[in-house]
Amino acid sequence: MGFDAASYEYSAGRIRFRVTPSTVRDNGVYVRLIQTNPANPVKNIRVVLSRDEYNFEKDLLSGNFMTFMGQFSTIRFMDLLGTNGSPVQEWNQTTRADQDTQAMPSGISIELLAKIIRRTGRNAWVNIPHLASNDYVTKLAQYLKANISSNRLIYIEYSN
């Protein structure tokens, strides 16, 4: 546990920690697993706010995140999609909604992007990876058309 996080309570299957946000170098939170039993390794790690502990599996998008995103008329997904330096060329290389993390070099899943737009009721500014094939662009457009309300604007930008 490090950067802006400090552990303060340990119990079976749980570590509680306090985060004191800073803007200095090496800020944020990191968790490092140093040792585990190979026969029964640590698994299913979740980092959630205490108030979201019992409902996070039902709703990945926390109230704070949605409130923050909801203040904008258009949400640019460049960083959330990992556009800069993205390795994605083909549609099957995008992050899947059911993957164990959305913090991938390929960015968040397009399904999660659509969910954010539906929940906030905002417009989307979507950046296409610079290596994306024509098939990727077509499938992205088809998915967004089918899964985002027609009264939302979707701006598409090639790369950054």
What is the role of each PLM region?
Residues M1-N160:
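Non-catalytic accessory regions flanking glycosidase/transglycosidase catalytic cores in CAZymes
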